[in-house]
């Protein structure tokens, strides 16, 4: 959740709570509040609606919480979205953030690998899966290692790059501990990885 005070036309209308964390969600809520107030909706009704809003499918969606480990599924597949998600995670948790990212499209990886490296600056541990190609054919020299190498060059943090789901799960089993947030990010099959990992956590942690 996130809490903030609303000041409208110089008047403090009080505190509002939204059911999702992150500065970007606060900004969206403020825009919605402004529209509501301008069209005559009272702040109490607006605040009640916002408090019950818990987000949309695959947008920082908490899929499981077991043994102090929070597992999140997130659709972010552009550097700006990735950064916003990780900042939201940082705002609600003092534990480690472990990001499992599946790059989407060879062309996007080629164009934005440097921006992706910077977007992951908030994560404590980065795990990269192979690129999800969707409709694209491979581009020579373009793999997840572009992001991996750029990240390692700029941020002295723990990071891994794997080609197989089994390798990812093996590494997670080795490193995940109490109070960690594990975020599965991407627009491809990574959401299936997340569901499978939730089952693993429930059964083995």
Language model regions located:
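Glycine/Thr-rich phosphate-binding loops of Rossmann-like dinucleotide-binding domains
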Residues: 14, 107, 136, 192-193
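Short amphipathic alpha-helical segments
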Residues: 84, 111-113, 139-140, 173, ...
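C-terminal helical cap/extension that packs against the catalytic core
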Residues: 117-178
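Short glycine-rich anion-binding loops that position phosphate/pyrophosphate groups of nucleotides
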Residues: 103-106, 131-134, 187-190
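Short, flexible loop segments at boundaries between secondary-structure elements
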Residues: 128-131, 200-205
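Nucleotide phosphate-binding/pyrophosphate-handling subdomain across enzymes
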Residues: 2-4, 8-125
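A glycine-rich beta-strand to alpha-helix segment
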Residues: 167-198
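Thr-Gly-centered strand-to-loop micro-motif
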Residues: 19, 72-73, 162-163, 184-185
């Amino acid at each position: 959740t996130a809490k903030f005070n609303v000041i409208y036309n110089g008047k403090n209308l009080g505190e509002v709570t939204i059911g999702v964390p992150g500065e970007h969600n606060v900004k969206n809520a403020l825009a919605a509040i402004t529209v509501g107030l301008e069209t005559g909706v009272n702040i109490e009704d607006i605040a009640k609606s916002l408090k019950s809003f818990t987000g949309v499918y695959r947008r920082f969606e908490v899929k499981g919480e077991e043994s102090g480990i929070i597992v999140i599924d997130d659709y972010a597949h552009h550097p700006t979205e990735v950064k916003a998600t990780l900042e939201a995670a940082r705002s609600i948790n003092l534990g480690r953030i472990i990001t499992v990212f599946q790059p989407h499209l060879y062309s996007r990886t080629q164009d934005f690998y440097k921006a992706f490296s910077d977007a992951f600056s908030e994560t404590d541990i980065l795990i990269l899966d192979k690129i999800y190609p969707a409709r694209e054919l491979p581009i020579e020299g373009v793999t997840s290692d572009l992001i991996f190498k750029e990240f390692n060059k700029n941020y002295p943090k723990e990071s891994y790059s794997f080609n197989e789901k089994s390798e990812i799960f093996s590494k997670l089993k080795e490193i995940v501990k109490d109070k960690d947030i594990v975020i599965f990010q991407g627009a491809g099959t990574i959401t299936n990885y997340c569901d499978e990992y939730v089952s693993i956590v429930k059964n083995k942690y």
